[in-house]
Amino acid sequence: TPPYSSAASDVYKRQGLAPKAVQLVKFARLLPSVVLSRIPYAEMSRLSGWNKADSLLAVDARLIDALPEMRAQRLVKAVSAQVPLIDSEKTSLIAFRPVDGGEEHVAIVIGDLDTDQAVLVRLHSQCLTGDLLGSLRCDCGDQLRGAIKAISEYGGGVLIYLAQEGRDIGLVNKLRAYNLQDLGSDTVEANHQIGFEVDERIYAPAAEILKQLGIQKVKLLTNNPNKIDQLAATGIDVIERVKHAFPPNPHNAEYLKTKAAKTGHLF
């Protein structure tokens, strides 16, 4: 993440190598900090053999930007099972993962689906602290349970549970951001201070799952316009945004205000 530091930083910026190197470590959920070194062309053949001998990874920089979409396209259905829920006894879970392994996402199919009509859909990013522990710092737990109840009452729909902890910066980095928030930063500033964008999520996996379920038209439970824009860009027709907001508490009130003021959330 800018600013880059080193005598050769202008070279890296012109070639676009620094952002791509940072993106690689973000994919690994590491702090986005890297050391760059230029390799003279004459040394490339020797280093190529060295990479193989020492099991070092070599990546074509041109493929890095396309990696999230490529992995989304490689998602396949791994398994499905009936899992009755408190708010919807007629529920099945369908797990998806890339054919070559990796992050697993889950489609929670609630009630009856009519894919000839617009399907009520919620895209929900994994939140260990909110979903499982009931954290008051966010509204994730309310949104998860509220979405399941709303879809059940509607008669059917899908909640796609995405492996995107902490707006896709990972649990460790999310907790680092919490520490910065306790020192006075808001959620946007904290992400920037540890080198991440305010929201690192890409919804191509969600779009691919919807398509594999035969869903092309959706009513989207969301307050986040970015979800609508990204789904629309993949060819999913979002015919309606369904408001999905819950009362704040003393611990998340400022967080929700920041989302409205700085990230365009619609409450």
What are the language-model segments listed below?
Residues 1, 16-20, 78, 103, ...:
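Conserved active-site and cofactor/substrate-binding residues in soluble primary-metabolism enzymes
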Residues 1-8, 12:
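Single conserved hydrophobic/aromatic residue that forms the stacking wall/gate
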Residues 150-267:
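Conserved structured catalytic cores and adjacent interaction surfaces
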Residues 41, 98-100, 113-115, 128, ...:
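Short, glycine-/Ser/Thr-/acidic-enriched flexible segments
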Residues 14-17, 22-87:
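Internal gly/pro-rich beta-alpha loop/helix module
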Residues 109-113, 117, 122, 138-159, ...:
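Phosphate-binding glycine-rich loops and their immediate beta-loop-alpha structural context
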Residues 54-130, 257-267:
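Long, charged alpha-helical interface segments
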Residues 129-140:
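Glycine-rich, acidic
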